[in-house]
Amino acid sequence: MPWYPWLKATVFALLAANAAVYAATGTASEALDSTAWLALLAAFEFETGFAGRFAGGRLAAVLRCVRLVAAAAILAAGIGYVLDGEWLDAANIGLWIVVVALLEFEVRYPAATARHRSQFKAAVATLYSGLAALVFAWLWQRDWFDAYDAALWLVAFATIELNLVGFGRGAVAGRGAG
């Protein structure tokens, strides 16, 4: 699909703009949260969106370091949300952490994921449903920017899921479409 790379680039640019807004006008937890997730998204995109070209070597080690630092920052932001009583944000981070853990498992162990595909799909559907419910909770609270940002993140991670099944430029090394 010729439009797919443009969709991913547009979503990434919008998320980068959101991170800038949170850095300029939000809390420290919001700034840390948005920039760390953006770094994690970029690392996942490199791993899943380029047909395994970055699966080995120096760049693979850099991507692992980026993921580790981003994960630590996300955990710190989550603690900040709990300490600030921002329960929707804390729940959002918790759900996304589990989504990322499942994505990591899917990238690292595709054969195991394939063997347990129905359970994996059910878990992912439950998590994404919870994340969608948070979008509606923010809308109900008239917190338009957080709702928009959360919806945009759902689109961003949907593109990673599409990468994993081979949509667009290619699948992860060792994975076929399907």
What are these model-predicted stretches?
Residues 1-178:
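Polytopic alpha-helical membrane-helix bundles and their juxtamembrane interface segments
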